Amino acid sequence: MKIVWYGHACFLVKTKGVSILIDPYPDVDEDRMEKVDYILITHEHMDHYGKTPLIAKLNDAEVIGPKTVYLMAISDGLTKVREVEADQEFQLGDVTVKTFYTEHPTSQYPLGYLILGEKRVAHLGDTYYSPGFRELRGQVDILLVPIGGRSTASEREAVDIIDIIRPRIVVPMHYGTYGSTGNVESFKRELQRRRVWVLVKDLKPYEGFEV
């Protein structure tokens, strides 16, 4: 499995022969992306939906997201579009994806995605802490978690989320862009202060790793 962070909340997950892009924001450079088969969108805000129409057309990729995203994609002229809700399960080739509700009050249908490939990857989109995340405990190897603190989890709340889910690896996201703050080093210090032991992958935009 390969995971690439393209900045903000945008990731590429390559697993079992399938390339899945998540939340392509407006400033992402599509020319630096690998081929994409599917695009998962967590919610309708433009810092997550941004370049979806362009990238979908360039790759002939299917767009998958909640009702608001489905309607936006149809309005943008896309035809390969699928609507999903929380607590669903679906297949992308040989990869199983599960949806779950996230705590983002300014969105109508905020979703997270649990991608079950060679490893289990959860993308939280925009979210605050939610006790419901306890249901993900034991199901996540790699957690993609926001730390920016503007309409989403702060560094402290991100540690709360990690402590309740207990993944093996964490990739911080959604910080230092579009008015969000957050800092990876202070996030790491908060983890240490709270004695929450997890491997943190501090990626630069367009960097990735294999697991």
Swiss-Prot record:
Which UniProt keywords are given for this protein, alphabetically ordered? Hydrolase
Organism superkingdom: Archaea
Q: Does the keyword Hydrolase apply?
A: yes
Q: What is this protein called?
A: UPF0173 protein PH0120
Q: Where is the signal peptide?
A: none
SUPFAM superfamilies assigned? Metallo-hydrolase/oxidoreductase
Family assignment from sequence similarity: Belongs to the UPF0173 family.
Q: Which organism is it from?
A: Pyrococcus horikoshii (strain ATCC 700860 / DSM 12428 / JCM 9974 / NBRC 100139 / OT-3)
Pfam families, per this entry? Lactamase_B_3
**GO molecular-function terms, A-Z:** hydrolase activity
